[in-house]
Amino acid sequence: MLKYIIPTIMLMPLTWMSKNSMIWTNTTAHSLLISLTSLLLLNQFNDNSLNFSPMFFSDPLSTPLLILTMWLLPLMLMASQSHLLKEPPTRKKLFITMLITLQTFLIMTFSAMELILFYILFEATLIPTLIIITRWGNQTERLNAGLYFLFYTLMGSLPLLVALIYIQNITGSLNFLMLQYWTQAVSNSWSNVFLWLACMMAFMVKMPLYGLHLWLPKAHVEAPIAGSMVLAAILLKLGGYGMLRITTILNPLTEMMAYPFIMLSLWGMIMTSSICLRQTDLKSLIAYSSVSHMALVIVAILIQTPWSYMGATALMIAHGLTSSMLFCLANSNYERIHSRTMILARGLQTLLPLMAAWWLLASLTNLALPPTINLVGELLVIMSSFSWSNITIILMGTNIMITTLYSLYMLTTTQRGKYTHHINNITPSFTRENALMALHILPLLLLSLNPKIILGPLY
């Protein structure tokens, strides 16, 4: 794993030593190189000894998430350029350094071998994200959003630390590969119920579970574009990854404890989708749609069948690319119109025809149109939940319908209709923006040709 961690760290001196005119070019080009080399990880499924050490390892579950993490850094740099146009060079370099630090922490989190190391890095990702939101956010409420983000996540993950120390005392090891062979079944005594809740809560807050999701719309709306992208695409997946890793250890307790959480997720999925239909703020709509998609992932992970695990990993990757692309599109609107209100940004299809094509593609992938991998993930989750309980098909069907409705509502509000008079003189879309959208949509389309590489360890 060091062949990805060290080049990423070396991007920092590159940033600070670059000429002011070359800051963006250098960092974007080199981070793109790193992300292209990360594709080599896909080859190593059969022979994992190649990327295996006492500290870091990668397996078919973490590999797609690692590649997604590395793929996103150049995209974040490309998206942030006009946001930081008026800042002095030192601040630009500081911003890029924050992104690189976050990237390094994330790579190490997804490949951590020990649960305590995973926990430390899981918490370390908070710091750069918080600085990005509170320093480079758009509105004055960004400090409030940062506080929400910090305290929700910290309150969730303190019990996890206690639980991990307790598991360490019982088993003598917190190694992921060792814990799989922990043969003693976890009985359903009261103390073990609390142990399960402590282990799960941190990841449930991060996902976020409906009811613990209030930090997410706030953080998304106030964050700068890079913050929104990394939050939607990767930080939410940390919760899913942690749950996938830890539920297998806590069997058979999970089977008993999962019921209330599955019910809450199914209810929250419908509720947040319905909230999307009434949103006026574009970023807020995309944030709530993230909550409803992640609720599906929570359901899939808690059902614990091979199909649902495959569906969860596929959905996480698909949602990461889709929501990141939607945030980029919302940001390109915001940079031209200086408002996130959807009513003010209507009728843009006549002014920016190519952008309208990207909007159409992004909305269609968001509503899981065949043949995208969003559909693959959703189908696997729906089938596994149907075999778990037949009634869920009604809820899933309702959710699909509402998702389609709000995706098309978002598309028609921003692109169709008579455009308002205050947007007569907007700049056309840049090549940079078109390249950014293409780099989001290409993986989505190419993965639909071979979805098995993102279906996780059970395929």
Swiss-Prot record:
GO CC terms, sorted: mitochondrial inner membrane
Transmembrane feature ranges: 22-42, 60-80, 92-112, 113-133, 147-167, 193-213, 224-244, 257-277, 284-303, 308-330, 351-371, 391-411
InterPro entries noted in UniProt: NADH4_N (IPR000260), NADH_Q_OxRdtase_chainM/4 (IPR010227), NADH_UbQ_OxRdtase (IPR003918), ND/Mrp_TM (IPR001750)
Taxonomy, superkingdom: Eukaryota
Keywords: Electron transport, Membrane, Mitochondrion, Mitochondrion inner membrane, NAD, Respiratory chain, Translocase, Transmembrane, Transmembrane helix, Transport, Ubiquinone
One biological process term in Gene Ontology: mitochondrial electron transport, NADH to ubiquinone
Main enzyme class: translocase
Subcellular location: Mitochondrion inner membrane
Catalytic activity: a ubiquinone + NADH + 5 H(+)(in) = a ubiquinol + NAD(+) + 4 H(+)(out)
Keyword Transmembrane: yes
Signal sequence residues: none
EC number: 7.1.1.2
Molecular function GO terms recorded: NADH dehydrogenase (ubiquinone) activity; ubiquinone binding
Membrane topology, as annotated: Multi-pass membrane protein
Pfam families: Oxidored_q5_N (PF01059), Proton_antipo_M (PF00361)
Keyword check for Mitochondrion: yes
Family under the similarity heading: Belongs to the complex I subunit 4 family.
Quaternary structure note: Core subunit of respiratory chain NADH dehydrogenase (Complex I) which is composed of 45 different subunits.
Function according to Swiss-Prot or TrEMBL: Core subunit of the mitochondrial membrane respiratory chain NADH dehydrogenase (Complex I) which catalyzes electron transfer from NADH through the respiratory chain, using ubiquinone as an electron acceptor. Essential for the catalytic activity and assembly of complex I.
Protein name according to UniProt: NADH-ubiquinone oxidoreductase chain 4
